[in-house]
């Protein structure tokens, strides 16, 4: 007759077997990949520069990271539903390209980290406590410096020495209002009067340009964030029609037919946003990640447009450009 095993031997054996099975199951199950909620003002997908930035850091969409993309299609009234949807999905990190959306997220969640790629005034709008120590769940990049408006006015003055009245065609919201306010100081120093004009909807643009010409503006500063190429082209065409030298701050403005553009290199901003995502995924807190100012500015000139409005760009200005679209049939 065999001696009976103590009961504890069987219990231990079962426990060991259960542990081994659990380990095998866990090994077979794919590790949870982080979800990035991405809300854009417009567009059909995340910025390619952002995707490249992630790849540089070892993240491949669908393999070790997932991006849940939503677009407002240029309609700010859609932010509330899209913000609620992404928060409801419990994404790990939120990325957005504008201040209004970031503020909407901040109202709904204080726990999901938010990375903003292009904030004009993160402190003034209440997104963060300070540039050095944001202090909440928002961090990221600002796309503007306080001197941007003044720099654009200086460029306009160089190509139009008799510049006296400049219209600022802009969007709504506190960031745009701050831009106008910060530009007033250098405008006074240059003896330029500013005329602030809210762009409104696409159907209002013709009337806005009539108002600008009625105000006798002889220069135009275009501050329209989030416009796609078709809408930018519409604005550029109207500026050409009214023979207004127009400098924009948006990427794609010169390609759309605008005379000149000066502003942060948006592609660099998006690649840097990927760095913020990486840091957050590795355990850093948004409250401790400083807001980053633009690292690179782009100055572009369209000589075709200059010719259309009868303007000659001085060589001293051309030499400083990072990109020049030459006249058609130019041999240079």
Regions found by a protein language model. Name each.
Residues 1-332:
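Short hydrophobic alpha-helices and adjacent helix-cap/hinge residues
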């Amino acid at each position: 007759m065999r001696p009976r095993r103590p009961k504890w031997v069987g219990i231990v054996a079962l426990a060991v077997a259960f542990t081994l099975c659990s380990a095998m199951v866990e090994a077979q199950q794919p590790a949870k990949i982080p979800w990035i909620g991405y809300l854009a003002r417009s567009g059909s997908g995340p910025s390619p520069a952002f995707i490249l930035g992630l790849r540089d850091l070892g993240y491949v969409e669908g393999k070790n990271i997932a991006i849940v993309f939503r677009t407002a299609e240029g309609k700010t009234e859609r932010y509330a539903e899209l913000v609620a949807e992404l928060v409801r999905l419990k994404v790990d990190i939120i990325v957005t390209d504008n201040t209004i959306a970031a503020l909407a997220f901040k109202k709904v969640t204080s726990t999901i980290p938010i990375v903003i790629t292009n904030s004009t005034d993160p402190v003034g709008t209440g997104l963060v406590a300070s540039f050095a120590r944001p202090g909440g769940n928002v961090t990221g990049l600002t796309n503007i410096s306080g001197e941007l408006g003044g720099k654009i006015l200086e460029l306009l003055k160089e190509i139009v020495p008799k510049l006296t009245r400049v219209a600022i065609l802009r969007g709504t919201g506190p960031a745009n209002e701050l831009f106008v306010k910060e530009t007033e100081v250098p405008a006074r120093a240059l003896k330029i009067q500013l005329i602030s004009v809210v762009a409104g909807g696409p159907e209002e643009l013709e009337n806005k340009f009539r108002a600008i010409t009625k105000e006798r503006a002889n220069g135009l500063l275009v501050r329209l964030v989030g416009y796609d190429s078709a809408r930018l082209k519409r604005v550029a065409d109207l500026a050409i029609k009214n023979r207004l030298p127009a400098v924009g701050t948006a990427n794609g403005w010169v390609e759309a037919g605008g005379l000149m553009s000066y502003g942060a290199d948006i592609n660099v901003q998006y690649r840097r946003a990927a760095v913020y995502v990486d840091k957050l995924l590795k355990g850093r807190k948004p409250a401790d990640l400083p807001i980053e100012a633009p690292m690179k500015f782009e100055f572009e000139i369209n000589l075709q447009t200059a010719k259309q409005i009868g303007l000659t760009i001085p060589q001293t200005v051309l030499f400083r450009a990072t990109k020049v679209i030459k006249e058609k049939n130019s041999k240079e």
